[in-house]
Regions:
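Conserved small/polar residues in nucleotide/adenosyl-binding loops
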Residues: 1-5, 177-183
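N-terminal glycine-rich "phosphate-gripper" loop used for MgATP/nucleotide binding
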Residues: 5-14, 32-36, 149-153
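Rossmann-fold NAD(P) dinucleotide-binding segment
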Residues: 12-30
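Generic hydrophobic/aromatic pocket-lining and core-packing "Φ" positions
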Residues: 17-21, 103, 133, 160
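General beta-strand structural signal in soluble alpha/beta enzymes
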Residues: 30, 59-64, 68-70, 93, ...
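Rossmann-fold NAD(P)-binding glycine/threonine-rich loop
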Residues: 34-56
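Glycine-rich anion-binding loops of enzyme active sites
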Residues: 44, 48, 59-89
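Short glycine-cluster motifs
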Residues: 87-134
Length: 187
């Protein structure tokens, strides 16, 4: 698998992502936060057009993500490796901080992780909760999954609906939406 990490300031990050897509890399992980939405829309549209024309599909994790880690095997991104322990629980979250908290709590009680994935919190991103849940569902190294949601969109709901009818493994879904939602706002 050919992969690239993108640690480029926001004005040039979309171009760096597209460069990796044009090179037919399998996976691009973009840590950069605050890439202009218009730039990311353009990259996403070009990625979809390339795939529609039969071009190779490149998976994009992020932007604004901490990356991913499979303990004792691979770490791509900025996740603190010392809190992770090898195990059989998958973790997926849009929030880096909440990912670290969940992983730290799991590790402290002796439950390790198969893989932890931070998908990123920017408005236009690549892989969604549902994509990672499908991967965990097929992963023989994962026995259960923690899915952590935030305020911001329908992705967590879509993943939860998919899990309800398709997931073969136990899922703990945590959403901080209503705990942090201003009282005068609806989602």
């Amino acid at each position: 698998m050919y992969k690239r990490q993108v640690y480029v300031p926001p004005p040039g990050a979309a171009a760096a992502i597209w460069e990796a897509v044009e090179a037919d890399l399998d996976l691009v992980i973009c840590i950069t936060e605050g890439i202009p939405v218009r730039d990311m829309l353009e990259v996403r549209n070009k990625m979809l057009q390339k795939e529609a024309k039969g071009g190779k599909k490149t998976l994009l994790l992020g932007p604004n993500c901490p990356g991913l880690i499979t303990p004792d095997e691979i770490k791509i991104g900025i996740m603190p490796g010392h809190i992770h322990r090898k195990g059989r629980i998958g973790v997926v979250s849009r929030s880096g901080t909440l990912t670290y908290e969940a992983v730290g709590q799991l590790s402290s009680i002796g439950l390790g992780q198969s893989t932890a994935v931070g998908i990123g919190g920017d408005p236009i991103n690549g892989l969604k909760h549902i994509d990672i849940m499908k991967m965990f569902n097929e992963d023989p190294e994962t026995d259960a999954v923690i899915m952590i949601g935030e305020i911001g969109g329908p992705d967590e709901v879509e993943a939860a609906r998919w899990c309800k009818t398709n997931m073969k493994k136990p899922v703990v879904a945590v959403s901080y939406t209503h705990l942090t939602l201003p009282t005068n706002r609806e989602v």
